[in-house]
């Protein structure tokens, strides 16, 4: 009899445990259940209404992370490594393709590609997803870090926390670091050839692209042989909206050139205005100065810094354990 009662109790526990552990993936009470977490959000812009694509993973009423991809003009795909880390910590997160990016509408009007308009878009996305200061966390990588910062300057009262990944608060400083710190580390002959192509603005030349891809990218963008770059990242790069990228960032990989929208962007003097918890992340071999990313964490009122000693611009891939242990630790420590 005792043995029977013991077996019954074990059976009951085994039936109950999955309900508790699977609540993270229980979409039964969510309005996006039919679409598996996908929500298409209409966005009002100065030239009309367009749709942007989002997809939710998981349930956590207190920790909801909106992912802001880089580029500008890239897409959510390279964030897919997060699926190896956030679910096991029960962190709810949202993929989101910004207007002009892969799964979202792609209007051609260049007047849309401004920082202020993208900030307004993020606020409309927040409202549509019903995120608020009790649960709303932004993780912005590269250009997404600029967008996250700018959103926080205008709407920090809507945020629980902000994570700025692999981005500095000044494009002029980024340009200086690329040209005067990283470029001289290249083989002199390689750098000479790169500069020759850039001097005549021949950025699409196959040799120029080959020099960048074989000598610069594996050192500072992702420290892996090109043939080993992960598929989600390759898909994201392949599907990048080049029109947005060139309009905002410019065609050069050594900073921002020409009349690109971001060329003069600098927010160093405004960092002290930010009160929310902020994590900045820098890679030792990044295209941007990790020391400035650390400095940024000290300028804001409630900042912390995560250094990835093996990481480059995509530290989430080439220093993955350090990166995600730090990110999930920061999120879990939030009230």
Regions found by a protein language model. Give the residues of each.
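Catalytic active-site module of serine/aspartate enzymes centered on a nucleophile-bearing elbow/loop
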Residues: 303-335
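Flexible "cap/lid" loop of the alpha/beta hydrolase fold
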Residues: 162-203
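The serine-hydrolase catalytic nucleophile loop
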Residues: 73-84
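Alpha/beta-hydrolase
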Residues: 189-272, 276
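Conserved loop-alpha-helix segment in the C-terminal half of the alpha/beta-hydrolase fold
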Residues: 268-310
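Conserved alpha/beta-hydrolase
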Residues: 86-106
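Conserved acidic catalytic loop of the alpha/beta-hydrolase fold
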Residues: 117-135
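Conserved hydrolase catalytic core segment
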Residues: 134-178
């Amino acid at each position: 009899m005792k043995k029977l009662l013991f077996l019954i109790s074990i059976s009951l526990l085994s039936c109950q445990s999955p309900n508790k552990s699977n609540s993270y993936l229980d979409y039964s009470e969510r309005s996006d259940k039919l679409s598996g977490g996908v929500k298409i959000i209409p966005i009002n812009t100065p030239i009309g209404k367009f749709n942007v694509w989002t997809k939710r993973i998981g349930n956590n009423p207190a920790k909801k992370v909106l992912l802001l991809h880089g580029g500008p003009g890239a897409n959510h795909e390279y964030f897919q490594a997060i699926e190896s880390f956030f679910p096991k910590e029960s962190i709810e997160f949202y993929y989101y393709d910004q207007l002009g990016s892969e799964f979202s509408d792609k209007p051609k009007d260049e007047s849309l590609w401004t920082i202020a308009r993208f900030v307004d878009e993020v606020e409309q996305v927040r409202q549509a997803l019903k995120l608020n200061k009790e649960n709303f966390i932004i993780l912005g990588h590269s250009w997404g870090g600029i967008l996250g910062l700018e959103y926080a300057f205008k709407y920090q009262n809507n945020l629980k926390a902000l994570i700025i990944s692999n981005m500095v608060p000044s494009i002029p400083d980024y340009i200086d670091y690329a040209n005067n710190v990283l470029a001289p580390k290249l083989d002199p002959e390689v750098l000479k050839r790169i500069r020759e192509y850039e001097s005549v603005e021949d950025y699409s030349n196959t040799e120029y692209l080959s020099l960048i891809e074989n000598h610069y990218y594996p050192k500072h963008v992702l420290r892996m042989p090109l043939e080993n770059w992960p598929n989600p990242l390759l898909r994201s790069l392949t599907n990048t909206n080049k029109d947005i990228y060139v309009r905002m960032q410019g065609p050069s990989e050594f900073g921002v050139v020409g009349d690109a929208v971001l060329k003069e962007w600098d927010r160093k003097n405004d960092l002290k205005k930010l009160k929310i918890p902020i994590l900045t992340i820098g890679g030792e071999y990044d295209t941007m100065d990790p020391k400035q990313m650390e400095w940024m964490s000290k300028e804001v009122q409630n900042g912390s810094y995560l250094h990835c000693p093996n990481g480059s611009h995509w530290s989430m891939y080439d220093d993955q354990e350090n990166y995600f242990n730090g990110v999930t630790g920061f999120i879990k420590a939030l009230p």
